[in-house]
Amino acid sequence: MHSMRLMAVAAIVALAACSSDKVTSLPAPVVPQATVLTVSGNIAAKVDEFRNLLGPANGGTAGEQTTGRREINWDGAGANPFDNKNDFPAGFFNSNVKAGAVFTTPGTGFRNDSTDFSEVNATYATQFNFFSANKIFAPVGSNQLDQLFQVAGQPTPALTRGFGIVFSDVDLADKTTIEAFAQDGSSLGVFSAPVRSDAGGLSFVGITFDNAIIARVRITLGTGVLGANVNDVSSGGTSDLVVLDNLIYGEPHKAL
């Protein structure tokens, strides 16, 4: 009987050892790979290429569309009452205009500007340029903003397959970026805008995925915050000041 107990104990120990030998770590999750388009200088052709990747323009049509894209250029008449102020509504582009976009910022607001921000700082008049005439955009009190996607005209979380931005006056490499996030909050990658390469000073970066998986993007504009006493590195300052123009993104589809 004693020997049988010893044999049983030995068998259990052997089984436990065998089981521990078979424990393996789970493979790291696979991050989907983006198709990335970048250009600086004469950006028009590359922007059109990106638009074509996403499909036809859906404008401000309310409701989820089967295919296509949305685009914000800041120039519509509906935004005029908010021009050159620091209180542009964060939800304007899903309430006033049904484009499926809502913005947040750690700063104090947003500014839609028709003066190249020269009313903020006179040196900006020659610093920034627009892509689509004539308004440009930036957060107030921060160089960072997030864009969240919703079904056009509805407060329903949505996902998009692609996102691109026109930037103005990128002076430093890898400081002006888009970071895309999935529905679970995981990062889908950080994508840098190229440095300006001509007097116009425009840069573009666009990303697309095979499927609609982007729930949010974080946009970082250079290294500094616009201000009356803050000059760009090209005007004797210490910060790379950047603003944005057109936002182009795939049709937001309801998140499941």
Predicted regions and their residues:
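Residue-level detector of transmembrane insertion/anchoring sites
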Residues: 9-11, 65
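Bacterial lipoprotein signal-peptidase II cleavage site
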Residues: 19-26
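C-terminal motif of bacterial Sec signal peptides marking the signal peptidase cleavage site
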Residues: 14-17
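Surface-exposed, well-ordered secondary-structure segments
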Residues: 26-256
